[in-house]
Swiss-Prot record:
A motif (Cx2C motif 2) lies at residues 92-95. Component of the cytosolic iron-sulfur (Fe-S) protein assembly (CIA) machinery. Required for the maturation of extramitochondrial Fe-S proteins. Part of an electron transfer chain functioning in an early step of cytosolic Fe-S biogenesis, facilitating the de novo assembly of a [4Fe-4S] cluster on the cytosolic Fe-S scaffold complex. Electrons are transferred from NADPH via a FAD- and FMN-containing diflavin oxidoreductase. PANTHER family: ANAMORSIN. This is Anamorsin homolog. A motif (Cx2C motif 1) lies at residues 81-84. [4Fe-4S] cluster binds at residues 81, 84, 92, 95. Belongs to the anamorsin family. Keywords: 2Fe-2S, 4Fe-4S, Cytoplasm, Iron, Iron-sulfur, Metal-binding, Mitochondrion. It comes from the Eukaryota. The lineage of its organism: Eukaryota, Discoba, Euglenozoa, Kinetoplastea, Metakinetoplastina. Residues 1-21, 33-119 are annotated as: Disordered.
Amino acid sequence: MSSSATSTQAFSLKTRQPIPDEDALLTEEDRILKQATKGEDCTTRRRACKNCVCGRAELERKLEAEGKLEAEALAMPPGGCGNCSKGDAFRCANCPFLGQPAFDATEDGKVKLNLTDDV
């Protein structure tokens, strides 16, 4: 090292700043526990879940018994984006095929599995 190039220390381990109190950083609004709220109607699916706890399954059964809810209305229609057959990475948020594997679009949404050996 040459005498003209001197290294200077940009920080010092001896000058420690006090650690701020974590409780002082929170406001009263942050301390209030927020209750998770569930939507009034489950709009993420076209039908009620198998283990429905929100009451939508009972409502659908009641409407179906009264004849106000048609069986076709409960059937899963094809999505509007046109990417339903490609897989979850390409599907829209309200796609009725979310969570299902990719399929051949010419077979009306039937999943065709490859059952051949890889070896």
